[in-house]
Amino acid sequence: SFISDVTLSTSAFGAQYDNPLSGVLQFKQREGNKESFNTNIRVSATDAAFTFEGPLFKNENKESNTSFLLSVRRSYLQSLFKLIGLPIRPDYWDYQYKVSHKIDDYNNLYIIGLGSVDEFSVETPDEYNESAQATLEQAPFIEQKTNTIGVTWRKRFKDSSGFMETTISNNRLENVFTNYQDPVNEAGIIFRNDAVESETKLRYQLTNFVGDWKIASGFNLQNSFYSNNTINNTDAIFYTTEIDFIKYGIFANATRSFYNDKLDVSVGFRMDDDTFTTSNDLLATFSPRVSLSYEFAKDWRISGTAGRYYKIAPYTILGFRDTNGFLTNQDSDYTRSDHYVLGLQHYLSPSASISLEGFYKRYSDYPV
């Protein structure tokens, strides 16, 4: 109920996106109702969801400058599994919200958040048999929490020459995975993995309309934190690591249409670096890309793209330490992916189309 548009890009990603190699899935959220309150309740076989939206600070105005969307979902799988006699108890909550505020005719503020709480546990079944015993011994205990919050300020220039967007956000993942000798009483740890990932980001994008060109440029700045604590009592392995570093990048992109909008051209680049790895710099991750799209007949388009993309290694690799406690992968290169794509698209209606796409993607410096 939040989503107004979804776009999947399997190549020719916008230069503003850092770290994708194979695809970008972009969600566009709608705004809440600015005139009245609406409620929606959905019930399925596994969960129930509640959505609420409406205006804030409306007063006597017909339309408020501020609106909100709030959705909460709760599972009742644990009750269902108990009813049918299974010892496992999956349990989850998730939520998302959006607040939109119109400051004036040229400035808007958006606050977006989403998160989840997942827990997986076991209980002694009413009928204890070999199958139930095997399930109890093998079932892990999982506790996972995710949270993302972002604030975006969008400013349109009064001379209609463009706009700018500034976004500050944080996303955090906490994951605890445990196996017990006595799962029912949660006693006697066999294995436990406790991991945390947190990213705090600042992104600025300036979009200008220069003649028939649309030019976007900007930068991103990110603080990355990762920690992992592992206990393996079976093999007497005890492992801990923690890293904290800055990642940054710059980008630019220019688009224009020619021949009465029959030919669309897009060219761009981005460069990325960080304070953790030692074998990379901005020039080493220079990633150009170009895209062409031509309408050769009514409702028919052929397109071609070529581009290079980079992605930093996963935190589990960057944070790995040897038996002496030294970080061994600071010399990791960014993974590189070169894309060559040719596609054909037919528009069935203003809101529907069908496309056929062929691509060649070559990866290098892939961590194994």
Feature names for model-found ranges:
Residues 44-76, 85-119, 141-164:
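Transmembrane beta-barrel wall of Gram-negative outer-membrane proteins
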Residues 10-12, 29-31, 43-47, 56, ...:
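Transmembrane beta-strands of outer-membrane beta-barrel pores
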Residues 1, 8-11, 16-39, 50, ...:
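N-terminal periplasmic accessory domains that precede
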Residues 3, 34, 46, 57-63, ...:
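Outer-membrane beta-barrel channels and translocator barrels
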Residues 39-43, 68-72, 111-113, 164-168, ...:
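Membrane-embedded beta-strand positions of outer-membrane beta-barrel proteins
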Residues 100-118, 140-280, 295, 355-356:
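Face-selective signature of the C-terminal outer-membrane beta-barrel domain
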Residues 19-21, 44-48, 91-93, 143-147, ...:
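Residues that define the transmembrane beta-barrel architecture of outer-membrane proteins
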Residues 125-132, 174, 227-230, 280, ...:
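Surface-exposed extracellular loop regions of Gram-negative outer-membrane beta-barrel proteins
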